[in-house]
Amino acid sequence: MNMLKKAGIACASVAAILAASAGTASAVSVDEYDDVKYVWCTDSGADVQIENTNAYGGTEDGTFRLSGRIGDGTRSCGWQTFNAGDDVSYVSTWITDEDGGYVYCAIYLDGVLVSQSEDRSSYYSVTGCY
């Protein structure tokens, strides 16, 4: 096989692998009685929208100003913990700042970090952990 044909096959193989994995969303699956902890951080003083799966598998959302200042005080964090009920299979959380700036989320299961994400967009910031 000539070199150009080999390179074409290699590129096609890589493209097929990437296409197969594109769009595959990972989900944080939980078992009954797992301890779940959500953590959110943002620029201090920012009002943010938070949406997450609750202990019963439903969705909760609201607008919050996180008050737990960290580091030099330019960032604030908050958290929520719960014990997963028998109706919960997957958990996720999202944080949005419609004015832009830093947003961060993380999910811990039984004290182990299983998902984290951040966004620093200047106009509209949103990130999700799932």
Which sequence ranges carry the predicted segments?
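N-terminal prepro-regions of secreted/extracellular proteins
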Residues: 1-39
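Post-signal peptide N-terminal regions of Sec-secreted extracellular proteins
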Residues: 28-130
